[in-house]
Amino acid sequence: MKIFREVFELGNKEIILETGGMARQADGSVTVSCGNNVVLVTTVVKKSVADGTDFFPLSVHYLEKTYAAGKIPGGFLRREGRPSEEQILISRLIDRSIRPSFPDGFFNEIQIVATVLSYDGAFSPDILALIGASASLAISGAPYDDVVAGVRVGYTNGKYILNPNKQDLRDSDLDLVVSGTDDAILMVESEANSLPESVMLGGILYAHKHLKTIINSINRLAKVASKPRIEYSIYQINKFLKSQIKSQFFGEIKNAYTIASKQERNLKLNAIRKNVLEYIFSSDVDGNEYTEKEILEAFHDIEKDLVRSNILEGKPRIDGRCTETIRPINVKIGVLPGVHGSALFTRGETQALVVTTLGSDRDAQLVESLDGIEKCRYMLHYNFPPYSVGECGMVGMAPKRREIGHANLAKRATQAVFPNEEAYPYVVRVVSEILESNGSSSMATVCGSSLSMMDAGVPIAEPVAGIAMGLIKDGAKYAVLSDILGDEDHLGDMDFKVAGTRYGVTALQMDIKIKGISREILEQALEQARVGRLHILGIMNEVIKEHKEAVSDVAPQIHVMNINPAKIKDVVGRGGATVKGIVEKTGAQIDTSDSGEVKVFAKDKKSMDMAVAMIEEIVAEVEEGQVYKGKIVKLLDSGVFVNLLGSQDGYLPFSEIEQAGMKTNSLVEGQGLEVLVQNIDRGGRVKLSLVAR
């Protein structure tokens, strides 16, 4: 067993790459270690293309084992179940980073599995998994020449932090992950606290310059441990077939791409495709040698060339816009009468119905991870039904990876403006239903979420808007597109999503289909996105620019009380009897804390007020010189104990009773008396006198 090892430093932390010791049946196997974190990453490459495959079947699976943190899984089976949303998001992050590095037309299946074997809690293992995925690919024999690396960057007190730990990130205004090759940026994922575009760009460039160290280490490992390059073929469009279709149908295709409506354009293009198939199969140009798949791929290549060349030549885009124009926007709030908050955001042919629901602490999501169980007060879910693109399909299934990814992006975009628990005790769930989609539905979700929460009375710090930018690049010529359509996303080279407030960026996500982009393009895209974002915010602000002061009449009510911690036991009562009685009488939910915090959550104001009044009566403090109506709770030889407020009793001597002209032999337990608090001693004992009738 021969072990190969590479060691490098990243942010003053030593990282070790090692191969040859584990999982030797895989084509590529690398363990990545940093401190007590260990991630095993394997790559398996199929040596032939499966029949009928017309895409690159790359799959990435990031898995966390609970034993890595010295824990036993919960649940009846006591074993790991399906991957959590966080694990799915990390899988997507790795996939998006490495996918652009493979040659176009490479259709061999590749599966990458990253398994967290040991975890110390200080650093997230995601960057180690990304580095390991690249290293295992580099030694697997796959056609992976442009080695990719990734780093995380934070930003605190005006300084960038390389490879920040979890504590650093809690204090950071930025959580930025950048991946790329030695000379190009391929993927960006970030969450920020309304930072200027210049800081975001600086963070991306700062991250990129530190990739070289990692890439050099991977290359050194590959030089000594790589398997022979597999034999593979690259699928290519048949140029002769493409020329035949273009010579006969280019005019019709060109006219179809002047139709602004997506549905009408697709109807026209489908009719042309049908005619193309009939022509090729019935003509004398060796049409019968071609499959339907080959013909349609050649047709698609003509479409791609047409759309891209039009934009690069300065001609109008598919829907007639110039590169910087935003589609028409329509904003409505309060569109659903029975919900707590709602908004309908429409941008061109993309439409999101976003609904906000308010709940109590008991509605918070409990998220289990290697760090333990965390309470999540803000949830955002994204649904993409098939009818949104005019198709039939599966409905009501578990969310797909894309839906999870879009929801996470929208949540990260709005997280920076979401109020903390002290300022806003509600738990909030936001759901985005995509009713129509023609590009940038995740950014429509960002806008709709901001509007919906303001409609529900959630005190977000600032409205947030999002915009998707695109890129068409051919050699030195390029065009940056604002507010891209679905076809422009599909046929273009970049999907660059930017969300933020009027003050700066809160989230940024970039995916590249080509071999990276330059600083100049990044700067232009960020500036163009800033202008577009402010335009969208202006339209949103015309409808609502700050949260409503009161929640909806149909929304639940919540009230937070801070009482003397010693009084919590009085509110709860023996065996919980007192609090249960309040709940039964009012229908409210009551949560208490040893710190003295009491949360009252009720379906309406009447129930809440009743519960609050009952609690206030229990915890009220008696004061000297005040008169109270009490009840006798205990008879003694020398006097009686009278209950005043809640569990507070006072002592009333017989002498005081007789002095007031009342006979002591007529007193019984439960009898009402009006008494005056004469004094309260240092021990809290209360002495009473009887108020004369």
Curated annotation (Swiss-Prot):
> Where is it localised?
Cytoplasm
Known EC number(s)?
2.7.7.8
Might you report a single GO cellular component term? cytosol
Cofactor(s) the protein requires to work: Mg(2+)
Catalytic activity entry: RNA(n+1) + phosphate = RNA(n) + a ribonucleoside 5'-diphosphate
In what residue span(s) does the KH domain sit?
A: 556-615
What GO molecular function annotation could you give as one example from this UniProt entry?
RNA binding
Q: What are the alphabetically sorted keywords of the record?
A: Cytoplasm, Magnesium, Metal-binding, Nucleotidyltransferase, RNA-binding, Transferase
Q: What is its main location?
A: cytoplasm
GO biological process assignments: mRNA catabolic process; RNA processing
Binding site residues for Mg(2+): D489, D495
Instruction: Tell me which Pfam families the record gives.
Output: KH_1, PNPase, RNase_PH, RNase_PH_C, S1
Q: How does it assemble?
A: Component of the RNA degradosome, which is a multiprotein complex involved in RNA processing and mRNA degradation.
Q: Which family does it belong to?
A: Belongs to the polyribonucleotide nucleotidyltransferase family.
Role summary: Involved in mRNA degradation. Catalyzes the phosphorolysis of single-stranded polyribonucleotides processively in the 3'- to 5'-direction.
- Name the record gives this protein: Polyribonucleotide nucleotidyltransferase
According to its UniProt entry, this protein's organism is: Francisella tularensis subsp. novicida (strain U112)
